């Protein structure tokens, strides 16, 4: 399990956290206790803003002048915007699973749009998280221009879930939601 991996990499201090799915469920406390018992380690449920703040630990977050990072999860999307020494973090209740289930709220999309229009335009957006990592790996790329990204995401969306699993070795859960994550 995770403990062996941590030991083999000399990791002695760690924290296990839960994000949007735990924040939004009605039985989060019961689920948290169940998991803690199963893994013999505390599990902390963090806020969306705390989740966004963690993006600051990304190796590229402190380099350069203006940076915008986005972490699109299943239930929420976090942004970390850095302009010189000024940092803004935001969390929106917009995620791949919410999108797939048509549970995104139009007001939340409007909040996101207003915030994006309020910040300095950026030339490069850095996506982090499982969906973008899986997508880029499937394209044998580490970055894409927006035109290429949209074109390749469109091509991927034409494949069935089964074909995505067979062609790109996506897990069933990833293959099921990746199109909604890339929209």
Where are these regions (language model features)?
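Helical "lid/coupling" subdomains associated with nucleotide-phosphate turnover
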Residues: 1-11, 19-66, 81-183
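Conserved catalytic-loop position in the HRD/HxD motif
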Residues: 71
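Acidic, divalent-metal-coordinating active-site segment for phosphoryl/phosphodiester hydrolysis
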Residues: 75-81
């Amino acid at each position: 399990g995770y403990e062996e991996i941590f030991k083999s990499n000399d990791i002695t201090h760690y924290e296990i956290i839960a994000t949007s799915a735990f924040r939004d469920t009605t039985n989060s406390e019961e689920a948290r206790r169940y998991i803690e018992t199963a893994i013999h380690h505390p599990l902390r449920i963090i806020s969306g803003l705390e989740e966004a703040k963690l993006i600051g630990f990304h190796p590229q977050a402190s380099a350069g002048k203006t940076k915008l990072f986005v972490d699109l999860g299943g239930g929420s999307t976090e942004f970390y915007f850095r302009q010189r020494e000024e940092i803004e973090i935001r969390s929106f209740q917009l995620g791949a699973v919410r999108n797939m289930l048509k549970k995104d709220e139009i007001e939340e999309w409007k909040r996101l749009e207003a915030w994006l229009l309020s910040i300095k335009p950026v030339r490069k957006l850095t996506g982090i998280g499982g969906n973008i990592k899986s997508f880029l790996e499937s394209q044998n790329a580490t970055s894409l221009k927006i035109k290429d990204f949209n074109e390749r995401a469109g091509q991927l969306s034409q494949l069935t879930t089964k074909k995505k699993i067979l062609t790109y070795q996506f897990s069933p859960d990833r293959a099921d939601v990746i199109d909604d994550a890339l929209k």
